């Protein structure tokens, strides 16, 4: 996925930040399919937990959600702390996102 906008939409799939709920959400045909929760503070976004509803698993929606969230963090100039194992695993598998994690924190996250 390329740089994030306010919402990314592809044939019935939409991803957007829901700051009032402190999470990014992915919807399929208008139905909430998953989310990744975060906390922000002083130029940092910490990803805490990611969930994709069982009925939507196996479609790559989690990866799309996290790519969008990380692209948005980059656009906003936020450093990333991947406390969520899914986000951490995504970054390990997509090294072009490692630079979002402060160098001093990479060892703690096995990056």
Predicted regions and their residues:
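N-terminal first-folded block
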Residues: 2-50
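Conserved acyl-CoA
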Residues: 64-79
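Conserved acetyl-CoA pyrophosphate-binding loop and the N-cap/start of the following alpha-helix
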Residues: 56, 60-65
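C-terminal structural segments of small proteins and small subunits
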Residues: 75-108
């Amino acid at each position: 996925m390329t740089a994030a906008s306010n919402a990314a939409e592809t044939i019935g799939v939409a991803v957007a930040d829901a700051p009032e709920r402190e999470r990014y959400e992915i919807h399929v045909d208008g139905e909430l399919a998953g989310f990744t929760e975060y906390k922000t503070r002083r130029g940092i976004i910490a990803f805490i937990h990611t969930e994709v509803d069982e009925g939507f698993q196996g479609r790559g929606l989690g990866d799309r959600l996290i790519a969008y969230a990380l692209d948005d963090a980059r656009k906003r100039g936020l450093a990333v702390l991947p406390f969520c194992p899914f986000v951490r695993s995504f970054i390990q598998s997509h090294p072009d996102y490692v630079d979002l994690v402060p160098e001093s924190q990479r060892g703690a996250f096995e990056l």
